[in-house]
């Protein structure tokens, strides 16, 4: 099984874009060449700010959703220190118990 990664790209105007992929370098190059997400087209210089393996596609999608819900300050902390990423992944991997 191919591992999935969560990544954050910083735009020229200091915004952070969150995405998932199986190949961070390939996806970053797609964004750089304008063939990636429309949200990044015309945003100037892009830099890869953060990437981390997250496991399978399902977990990657949940992690992406959760990171997109974070505030800019929380995302900046994640980029700078990786703070909270392990806990975030752990919370996503914990099975939820359904009550009847």
From Swiss-Prot:
SUPFAM superfamilies: GIY-YIG endonuclease. Coiled coil: none annotated. This is UPF0213 protein YhbQ. PANTHER family: UPF0213 PROTEIN YHBQ. The gene is yhbQ. Residues 2-77 form the GIY-YIG domain. It comes from the Bacteria. HAMAP family: UPF0213 (MF_01029). InterPro entries: GIY-YIG_endonuc (IPR000305), GIY-YIG_endonuc_sf (IPR035901), UPF0213_domain (IPR050190), UPF0213_GIY-YIG_endonuc (IPR022992). Belongs to the UPF0213 family. SMART domains: GIYc.
